[in-house]
Amino acid sequence: GIPMERVRGILLTHDHSDHVRFVYSFVRKYRHIGVYCTPRTLNGLLRRHSISNRLKDYHRAIYKEHPFRVGNFTALAFEVLHDGTDNAGFFITHGPHHIAVCTDLGCVSERADFYMRQANYLMIEANYDAAMLAAGSYPEYLKARIRSDNGHLDNCITAAYLAEIYSDSLKNIFLCHLSKDNNTPE
């Protein structure tokens, strides 16, 4: 790991609780860290969750398709399709390294595809196994939400997409946002 004194920011993709639950307590402990998200995302998380309005003190407003700096990194937020408030993926550059972060997306949009194809390092969700979701205990409305274009990517869609974009310039792929109920790391 790296010392927390070197961390300069938290990039929020959207306002769902699994992404923002501990952000305020974290920045209260590490006061030098900024919270980077769009103003709409910040308003959504303050409206939807019992997080202190003091989070605004740490907010660094960003706008999609406009590069911004976080320490030695240049980052850019871009549109992804999901059912949160003003969802974003991130394209992060540090020297020759290009990192795309795409979690919580129901399908690969044109903008997400554009940035993921440029990445040397890719974080992409493989949220659920379709058979496990279908056989699982979630109510039908939740299963439909997860499967929708504004929901999550299933393993087969993620695998097919990765096979399509793979090149020698892609150094590492990190599968993330795996459902604990509808997926396995295998």
Regions found by a protein language model. Name each.
Residues 1-37:
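Active-site metal-binding motif and surrounding structural segment of the metallo-beta-lactamase
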Residues 1-2, 63-121:
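Core dinuclear metal-dependent hydrolase active-site scaffold
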Residues 7, 56, 119-120:
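Short, well-ordered alpha-helix to beta-strand connector turns
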Residues 7-15, 36-39, 100-104, 123-125, ...:
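Active-site neighborhood of phospho(di)ester-bond hydrolases with catalytic His/Asp-centered motifs
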Residues 16-20, 43-44, 84-85, 108-110, ...:
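Active-site environment of divalent metal-dependent phosphoester hydrolases
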Residues 41-61:
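Active-site neighborhood of divalent metal-dependent phosphoester bond hydrolases
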Residues 110-186:
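Cap/insert and terminal regions of metallo-dependent hydrolase folds
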